[in-house]
């Protein structure tokens, strides 16, 4: 066959078109003349956001060609994290999936393709970006303020320029990767450029096509007189009624190769591209968007010339055919001019068609749609109708041309080779024309060769078990069709596809059997598993070759059985050939007929050693030769006893004849040795020794907990009885002699003398030794004495397994009957989930076909990652056939458009709104995971948020999870906000959470943070405690946090005392004693002891249970408890309150503030309830372990002060400490204020905002994109300005010290006081605008480094800055926003906390010595404000004025900001609140 030099084969194709999920459905619709442009209902249009005004407009056409599932994508398959998938242009998503299907259709696995693959693709401008993603952003911020990282990332995921390179990146393609943009002709131009690339040798295979989606999707369009769109919603090319086109959505691709290369590779060829051409209209036309008939004629004529064909041989043209009154006549004019060049008369008219009548105009994908339609016409030798064609547009003058329009489906009649042209013309003038030809007969027709005899192995794989199940069902359905493909071709086609992690291998006999097997939930002929990966290397290209991972195991005496491998002998010529060769050799040496012994069992006894050992050698040797024909090679051999001779023969130590002689002699001499017996014992070799009689010896160690002993029969019998009486499992081994013991000594001399006369060679494949349990050296292999000692020495099989299982992904193949050796391997301590075992032969009790078992085992090897050459099961001329493509998961990844709010919600930096559209990518991470440090908890949360997943495996590779360089930048930026120093490069060096955590923690260790400096030292107090002792409440014992528990009356004082003892002994901070030493406070931790701080009280008589009087009595006793505490060295005090008869009792706790923060209270609450539950159940109290105690943390604090992250903030704190210009209290109006206040010198004013006022605050938060704390502080600034005066006030704020600058400690379960305190300047002015004031506070809070932890370290621990900062006056006011206090429902549990959860926030006396403490919290839908003040320093009138003015200032601030005409603030983030509070606020924000 002559092959044109410039011919290109179409070897694969795929597409999704309106009304068609794939190419097969597309042809079905074309053949049936189905129009896939649908009418949209009014409800559909309303749901899509179409207004009533538009619906009422008569110019609005309610028609559209639609694609199903444009919001769905298999993100996991392509390695996209959910969040990245959500913002990826759906045009790119569909192109990715169709590209994969096209490669599958071509039988091309890019990973195995020997050559480069190019990509030429196109997509329309991203409507998803413009309509959906950017609707969540202020257009001024996007367009007018310059490019930022988030915007760049967003455009990278959506711009058409990145379509082709995205495919190349996803599939690891190395050829040219070109995005093509010529408007409507783009996808056909892409095909042309791909052909040129193939012809020039730039690539060896190419993908070409286009993707176009109309978004919004389920909407109509507007028409107007003279426009190019149809007023009736039908595209009617060439018809007299043609009034325009209808734009639609679709995607299509073809896979191309040079024709000669495709034929040589045996590819299936759908059609042949004989030539193509492109040009441009230039300016000789009515306008930029108008067509040019002369240019169109030129491009068609040039394509004919390039193809080397005469236009008279073209019998069909797929036209651009838009159905416009202007475009169609011009196109026919150009066609007529191009075809009139021919001087050859035509035998029949040339048929015209346009797929736009079926599916509309697919914009940039229009050309590929026409090309695929035409290829299908060539394959099916038929031409579908051009819909809506009744009579020609007279402007076409078809009667003066060689053309006719196909108006109904019919055969493609042709005298010679079928040829067709495909045109595509773009707005702007780029024209393209491709000449197609039907595939050569030799390539298009399935070979008439008979189906090969015997079963086939069907291989399927998928990324998930669910996808594999869908593939099985779809394949079964395809095989059940009447004209289904040949089974051997199905197996061949599937074997050429790329393999995924979840695999299935099925041994099937015919199509009906295959369908049954595929549909069965379980079947003996099916193996389903996961590919084994090296735990260190995974899928990396530099991982060990699969042959090095494979180890062949050859069983020995005892594995034999009559009929073994009979099915293989009868059906596999290779096996039979090698069996016969060995059998002939053994017949010559021993006179034994192994055919009769093995297959019939009629000769003598296969249990006899002189029969069984030759039989095993013959079967296993033939089996190894058979598996070798399938390309399976091993990197090492282990033989068990006799099996070691088979291993050595295959490794080249013995030639076959020498091996047969050696095994024959060995078997005869062993048979002639004194009889004995053997038993397997469930004990290790050391443990079994104490039970052994004198003449019983260790014979084999198969795994560390099992061994075999051997000796005389009577002594073995006695041993069995003794072991049975001791309860030790013991079982008989099929053996007639005491093998591998000194009982074999008499034969050794004769055997060694024989071997010394034989030639032994070093092995070609490494061997493990039964004798030593390690690798055989060349010297050992060729030494006859070693082989002789093996006979009488114990087999150290467990040690051999110890060696091979040290490699993380070994594949152990038992090459022989049964599965005893692989069974021992799976019991070995080094066995792991990355190891695999495969058994090539059935167990004697299994009633299954030998060949099916063998082929299924080959399938298991393939599943484990071993390359299997399936050629022996292929027909002489295999063919690719059309089979269902990969069943991509249909998971929704979509951001709905937002038509009302432009401002971007925090956390939606990549274009998605706050939260997620479908809930599938919520990134909520539990901060209490076993085995994770605080560093890892934070990194886990950051990774989850950036990847858009709910959790991340700590050992998963960041880049395998879909991470890339841009996401690495996002993670580094997020980590910086958490106080962790990470660079994007760190993720390349440490790509797992575990390794990155270790690296981050190691950086702390380098600064002396990893270990306490002195293990036995009494630690100094941390900075916050120093602050408290230095400047806080004078009667330090009074600073207490109260908790109330309600107890079932059956709980007595012994129970309470036991619980409190357990909790106090569990948490060292609760045993804290402070000791002053020369002006320096030290912490002493008392030894665990019984809790003695429990007193007992009763509710007064006559008070009813549950009454208000009882509540008042309980609160009164609690108040007395708090007042009575004067000693700070009793961190926990408690009182039990016995209530009225039959009513609940109460337990009141008073916890010193020095040992508790919000997290500590949660820990204590959990532990107390847990301890009570265990106590009441009669169990020992066992609480969850504490990884790092308070004492250890305190020892590390000094090192934190010299950490670079803290030292880097020195200038910030020194500068800010001098900014205050206004003080609420006189510095020292009289001497007594130089001392901290006593509890009785503090008083409180309380107020509550109504639910409506609080809602106003929430509305302000949403509108201004500012945190609650920011708004409250701004209102505080206004309040101070109005009541005290204008200036800058220093305000003390709180931070969360647990989660910042984390050393290598785990504080998740540590009880202690980790709250940090730091000052910030607050501007107080009456003339400052509301938005300006909010911005000023926002920027102040945003600038605070590391939640303020560095301030305390530099103030109280680091001496150089301590002197400077200590000279500054303590801020007058302390502000604390405690967030939302939950309401606990009352229940009937025996132990439950008081439902009033405001008590621990509301009641504690301020302890930090400020003139004013403003404590704000949310409860019951209202905002509560507690103003505590030092009566010595703040006049009551001032305090009352502040309390009275604040709500008014807050309301005025919000109203003024709302009334502003525009917002000016930066909405990139909300900072400044305690971490937990910030998360609560963010989660409650509206998506828009």
Curated annotation (Swiss-Prot):
The keyword Transmembrane helix does not apply. The active site is at residues 184, 320, 361, 641. Binds 1 phosphopantetheine covalently. Residues 930-1004 form the Carrier domain. This is Phenolphthiocerol/phthiocerol polyketide synthase subunit E. NADP(+) binds at residues 1286-1331. Keywords: Fatty acid metabolism, Lipid metabolism, Multifunctional enzyme, NADP, Oxidoreductase, Phosphopantetheine, Phosphoprotein, Transferase. Residues 5-438 form the Ketosynthase family 3 (KS3) domain. Its cofactor is NADP(+); pantetheine 4'-phosphate. It comes from Mycobacterium bovis (strain ATCC BAA-935 / AF2122/97). Disruption phenotype: Disruption of the pps gene cluster abolishes the production of both phthiocerol and phenolphthiocerol derivatives. Deletion of the gene abolishes the synthesis of phthiocerol dimycocerosates (DIM). Pathway: Lipid metabolism; fatty acid biosynthesis. The modification O-(pantetheine 4'-phosphoryl)serine is found at residue 965. Part of the PpsABCDE complex involved in the biosynthesis of the lipid core common to phthiocerols and phenolphthiocerols by successive additions of malonyl-CoA or methylmalonyl-CoA extender units. PpsA can accept as substrate the activated forms of either icosanoyl (C20), docosanoyl (C22) or lignoceroyl (C24) groups from FadD26, or a (4-hydroxyphenyl)-C17 or (4-hydroxyphenyl)-C19 fatty acyl from FadD29. PpsA initiates the biosynthesis and extends its substrate using a malonyl-CoA extender unit. The PpsB and PpsC proteins add the second and third malonyl-CoA extender units. Its EC number is 2.3.1.292. It catalyses: icosanoyl-[(phenol)carboxyphthiodiolenone synthase] + 2 (S)-methylmalonyl-CoA + 3 malonyl-CoA + 5 NADPH + 10 H(+) = C32-carboxyphthiodiolenone-[(phenol)carboxyphthiodiolenone synthase] + 5 CO2 + 5 NADP(+) + 5 CoA + 2 H2O; docosanoyl-[(phenol)carboxyphthiodiolenone synthase] + 2 (S)-methylmalonyl-CoA + 3 malonyl-CoA + 5 NADPH + 10 H(+) = C34-carboxyphthiodiolenone-[(phenol)carboxyphthiodiolenone synthase] + 5 CO2 + 5 NADP(+) + 5 CoA + 2 H2O; 17-(4-hydroxyphenyl)heptadecanoyl-[(phenol)carboxyphthiodiolenone synthase] + 2 (S)-methylmalonyl-CoA + 3 malonyl-CoA + 5 NADPH + 10 H(+) = C35-(phenol)carboxyphthiodiolenone-[(phenol)carboxyphthiodiolenone synthase] + 5 CO2 + 5 NADP(+) + 5 CoA + 2 H2O; 19-(4-hydroxyphenyl)nonadecanoyl-[(phenol)carboxyphthiodiolenone synthase] + 2 (S)-methylmalonyl-CoA + 3 malonyl-CoA + 5 NADPH + 10 H(+) = C37-(phenol)carboxyphthiodiolenone-[(phenol)carboxyphthiodiolenone synthase] + 5 CO2 + 5 NADP(+) + 5 CoA + 2 H2O.
